[in-house]
Amino acid sequence: MSDFEQLFAGKLPKLIMFDLDGTLVDSVPDLAVAVDTMLAELGRPTAGLESVRAWVGNGAPVLVRRALANNLDHSGVDEALAERGLDIFMRAYAEKHEFTVVYPGVRETLKWLQKMGVEMALITNKPERFVAPLLDEMKLGRFFRWIIGGDTMPQKKPDPAALFFVMKMAGVPASQSLFVGDSRSDVQAAKAAGVACVALSYGYNHGRPIAEENPAMVIDDLRRLIPGCLDLDAEILLPDIKRPSSRESIVVVTRKLWMKVIKALARWRWRA
């Protein structure tokens, strides 16, 4: 029995929400360059690739604080120093993404899902200002109907607010939705939203095997998600999906738009 058959009784979900860093793209090399630039400018030892790989996943402010602490525990970092470090990091990271790469199988799988009429959204903790340019550089933006950054809404993952928002906008219930990510925050957000979560084994989870977070399924290649995803004649039952005559506009959710719908989502507010 295939992965999707296990989760959705032989059908495709109507909506799939994806994380970005560590799920679709490996961005750690560029993040590490920006972190080391920040540390060097502050007169501190550089961190290096593997340390940064263990620190990413909770947004830029947390990454900067962890780098300043040289530890996952950043509770003792001075607030003024953290703000200064964040400004330097944001400036350095905005300059280029020359070392970021798309993981194998990602484009093929997204193309297949798009052909099958599955709605797709991107929900990331990466600051909003970096998301669209990176997607354009990687040629991934056209696959997503909704794109939400880490500072787009008042909450970020593991809070499930963004998942609830996308499901409401898509008109798709949690039972017909899937979240695909690579970290504890992704799994927790999906569980809190009542959505099945498939996790990638190759991503960023602070050095812990993602299986320890108990997602519904762990895979090592996105192409494993769908049987025959490279075979456009694969026989998979599809839900009743209204296919647009032409691809509808991508909706990049911004903070301004979010404030217009926050009241509608209030009843779903997650409480830890």
UniProtKB/Swiss-Prot annotation:
Keywords: Carbohydrate metabolism, Hydrolase, Magnesium, Metal-binding. Pfam families: HAD_2 (PF13419). It catalyses: 2-phosphoglycolate + H2O = glycolate + phosphate. Its cofactor is Mg(2+). Mg(2+) binds at residues 19, 21, 182. The active site is at 19 (nucleophile). CDD domains: HAD_PGPase. Pathway: Organic acid metabolism; glycolate biosynthesis; glycolate from 2-phosphoglycolate: step 1/1. Its EC number is 3.1.3.18. GO terms for molecular function: metal ion binding; phosphoglycolate phosphatase activity. One of its GO terms (biological process) is carbohydrate metabolic process. SUPFAM superfamilies: HAD-like (SSF56784). Transmembrane segments: none annotated. GO terms for cellular component: cytosol. The keyword Metal-binding applies. PANTHER family: PHOSPHOGLYCOLATE PHOSPHATASE. NCBIfam families: HAD-SF-IA-v1, HAD-SF-IA-v3, PGP_bact, PRK13222.1-2, PRK13223.1. Belongs to the HAD-like hydrolase superfamily. CbbY/CbbZ/Gph/YieH family. Specifically catalyzes the dephosphorylation of 2-phosphoglycolate. Is involved in the dissimilation of the intracellular 2-phosphoglycolate formed during the DNA repair of 3'-phosphoglycolate ends, a major class of DNA lesions induced by oxidative stress. This is Phosphoglycolate phosphatase. It comes from Pseudomonas syringae pv. tomato (strain ATCC BAA-871 / DC3000).
